Amino acid sequence: VFTVISVTVTLLTAYPMSRNDFMGKKFFNAIFVFTMFFGGGLMPTYLLMDQLGLVNTVWAILLPGALNVWNMILARSYYKTVPIELYEAASMDGSTEVQYFFKILIPVCKPIIAVLCLYQFVAMWNSYFDAMIYLDDQNLQPLQLVLRSILVQNQINPNLVTNMEKLAETAKLADLLKYSTIVISSVPLIV
């Protein structure tokens, strides 16, 4: 779900940024680049999510990352490689901006769409911090947060084990559990 939302928002945002005739293009580009370098901070972002009623909902994870500025810059750069003659021919045939975008530009841009989908899927798959901050409900926690808790909880305190052989055996089992958990959770990325 996140990949579809993010790629859709990214593609729709990148299109006007790629057009030379878009008024305010430099202003919006400056705002987007500014947000790449300077975030709002953890506490203000949490307070905003809380006031919007998004804490303990899936939307607290999906909405803040819906527009990835770096991916928008990639899509914008790819849009600029599409010949302007396609747009001119479509406009001469009576095509609107929306028709040109969905019927001509999107089919031509399938490679960048595939790249953006891959980037967003891997980014969401690897993120657990937002879920750790915004989701208290155990039923809403993603697999990454569950894996993190398994890996953190299986730490062995050597002061509690008196027999060194037992300590080594327990450490091997804990490591085996960690590694098998990581391998099993990586299957969707490989497939």
Regions found by a protein language model. Give the residues of each.
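A hydrophobic, multi-pass inner-membrane permease signature
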Residues: 1-191
